[in-house]
Amino acid sequence: MTNHPKMTALAVEFFARFARFEHALKEIPEFRNGDEDGVKPNWDVFGQAAEIAALYSAIVAAPKAQYLVQNPPRKRIVRSGILEWKDMPKPQNTMEVLVAIRRVRNNLFHGDKGNPNLSRNVQLFEACIAILDMALAANNDVLLAYEINQDIS
């Protein structure tokens, strides 16, 4: 993926932590959607939980976390048949911050992080990790599922 050791380590750390976080959400009945065909984390319900919704002011005040709010990840689009990046508005609440974190994950997973040596990517990964940590600290049920059940086989 890259020759930049810090970028590689952060990308792997973010991706692994994001995966564990989604797994933890699925362990909590109120934070999952699913049936016999599959299960998905319900990020919207999680983001609406009072303790999570209240995190926005802490996110914008935290030096590492605020980078995501001030410099939101761009969205990959096709305009007139040409693949482009679309600038996205700054998140105005925790729900929108969670969408931005998922966009960073999608851009990474689908290979759209571009030049991996850009300090912007490093800062986005650091911000996402910081915010996920804040969300874990705010919800004991998700934290417990995150810490105890690490088997995501």
PLM regions and their residue ranges:
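Amphipathic alpha-helical interface elements
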Residues: 1-100, 114-115, 121, 143-153
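Charge-enriched, short contiguous segments at helix-coil
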Residues: 92-103, 107-138
